[in-house]
């Protein structure tokens, strides 16, 4: 049986009897993927677009499968002169993230936002200095990026310190 790859992160499932004497390399690579899922990465943005790859569209053996989009917590850095649209690829890869927009202004017209997209579906805009928890549905060309905390249902909320609600600080 030939090796196959998981659809989420391209983790290689070694076929029965394959890779005799070499399976350790594949296993270590798979462990590197799992480590990224539980880790943090700062990603420097520049210009007005960036592609954040979750996994290769057609994964193969080797470290070329390791992608920045495998990290679940990503801090966007870099000096922007305009809003930056980050495309999460491929559009068939479902994923979730915690993002921070820690970019700076390269001129005097900012601060600038990071716009997250995966397909023609919904997009999310993260304002400068803000964080978001999002998920990508991986629905192909119509894929959407969704704010996981929109319409948040909370039974009881306790706030210590100031709270800003609809622009009013209490």
Residue spans for each PLM region:
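Intrinsic low-complexity, repeat-rich intrinsically disordered segments enriched
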Residues: 41, 45-51, 117, 122, ...
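Acidic, glycine/polar-enriched metal-coordinating patches/loops
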Residues: 2-9, 77-154
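Glycine-rich, flexible loop motifs
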Residues: 50-83, 93
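Extracellular "spike/adhesin" assembly and maturation modules
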Residues: 1-63
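Generic, well-ordered alpha-helical segments
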Residues: 19, 27, 66-68, 80, ...
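Extracellular receptor-binding modules and their adjoining Ser/Thr/Gly/Asp/Asn-rich linkers
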Residues: 30-45, 130-145, 164
């Amino acid at each position: 049986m030939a090796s196959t790859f998981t659809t989420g992160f391209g983790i290689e499932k070694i076929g029965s009897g394959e890779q005799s004497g070499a399976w350790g390399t594949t296993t270590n690579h798979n462990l590197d993927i799992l480590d990224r899922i539980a880790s943090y990465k700062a990603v420097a943005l520049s210009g007005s677009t960036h592609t954040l790859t979750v996994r290769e569209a057609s994964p193969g053996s080797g470290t070329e499968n390791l992608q920045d989009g495998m990290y679940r917590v990503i801090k966007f850095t870099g000096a922007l002169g305009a809003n930056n649209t980050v495309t999460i690829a491929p559009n068939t890869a479902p994923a979730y993230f915690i993002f921070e927009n820690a970019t700076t202004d390269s001129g005097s017209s900012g601060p600038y936002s990071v716009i997250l997209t995966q397909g023609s579906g919904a997009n999310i805009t993260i304002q400068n200095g803000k964080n978001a928890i999002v998920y990508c549905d991986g629905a192909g060309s119509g894929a959407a990026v969704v704010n996981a905390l929109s319409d948040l249902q909370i039974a009881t909320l306790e706030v210590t310190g100031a709270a800003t609600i609809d622009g009013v600080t209490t």
